[in-house]
């Protein structure tokens, strides 16, 4: 690829989680993707997708989003000097992520209905206008996000026994499969952890009813379902025991490990920063104190 649109993404820390691991019966590591430039793992894929769009002379980029993709797409489009249109399901996007997209100058279009409806509209816009769709249906997104798996192997010095990550649309699960294949060290047991209340979960990043990559993701990973109380409990524990302030959806991996209790070396992927979703943070802390 001749053109590189980058904000310095990747190379995120892999941190031991000994206090979280107490009682779980495993050696626990935390892949801290909140350290990426816009605060989530989406940056890994967006650098590749937007670089490709710029190289191909695309007039702009478009995507549907519940938040993290919007923030990342807007930032990388601004870096590339390309316009961006973000299609959002009305009322479903966390305030922190919305602020990032607005600050970067993206055009926001709110639509009624679910993420799935926003996704259909974004695909139609891309087809009608000739813009590049940078949702995870774009293979460049998956290719970029695959880099995290190789980093884990390099940072650990070996293949972990288990990798657990949040399961929303399924694109990141597919990316990890691809990344471990590229690393050539084999594939660990993958836990794709979803919210039981997919429609209404407070973890907005995985509030997706119809995963776009369901078939591929569920063929490669073991799907684990956790409840709202489990998500909230482990989200608070990650901050209080290990000092990492992640967004609620990021706690899904740890919650899934707590439910399944795998042995060996376990890596949980914390996909985004807690500042992404201040309303969820405030409401849950307030309800706990109350």
Sequence positions of predicted segments:
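PLP-dependent amino-acid enzyme catalytic core
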Residues: 1-290
């Amino acid at each position: 690829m001749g053109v590189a649109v980058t904000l310095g993404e990747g190379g995120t820390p892999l941190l031991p989680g000994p206090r979280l691991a107490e009682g779980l019966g495993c050696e626990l590591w935390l892949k801290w993707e909140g350290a990426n430039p816009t605060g989530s793992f989406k940056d890994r894929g967006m650098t590749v997708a937007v670089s490709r769009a710029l190289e191909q002379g695309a007039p702009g980029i478009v995507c549907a989003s519940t938040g993290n993709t919007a923030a990342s797409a807007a930032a990388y489009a601004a870096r590339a000097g390309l316009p961006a249109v973000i299609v959002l399901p009305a009322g479903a996007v966390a305030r922190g992520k919305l602020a990032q997209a607005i600050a970067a100058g993206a055009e926001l279009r709110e639509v009624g209905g679910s993420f799935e409806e926003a996704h259909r509209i974004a695909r139609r816009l891309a087809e009608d206008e000739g813009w590049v769709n940078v949702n995870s249906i774009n293979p460049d997104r998956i290719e970029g996000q695959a880099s995290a798996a190789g980093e884990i192997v390099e940072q650990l010095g070996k293949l972990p026994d288990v990798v657990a990550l949040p399961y929303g649309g399924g694109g990141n699960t597919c990316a990890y499969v691809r990344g471990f294949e590229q690393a050539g060290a084999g594939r660990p047991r993958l836990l794709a952890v979803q919210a039981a209340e997919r429609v209404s979960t407070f973890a907005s990043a995985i509030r997706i009813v119809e995963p776009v990559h369901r078939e591929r993701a569920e063929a490669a990973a073991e799907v684990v379902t956790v409840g709202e109380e489990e998500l909230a409990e482990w989200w608070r524990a990650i901050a209080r025991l290990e000092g990492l302030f992640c967004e609620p959806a990021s706690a899904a991996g740890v919650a899934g490990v707590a439910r399944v209790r795998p042995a060996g070396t376990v890596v949980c992927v914390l996909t985004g920063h807690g500042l992404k979703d201040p309303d969820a943070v405030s409401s849950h802390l307030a309800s706990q104190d109350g």
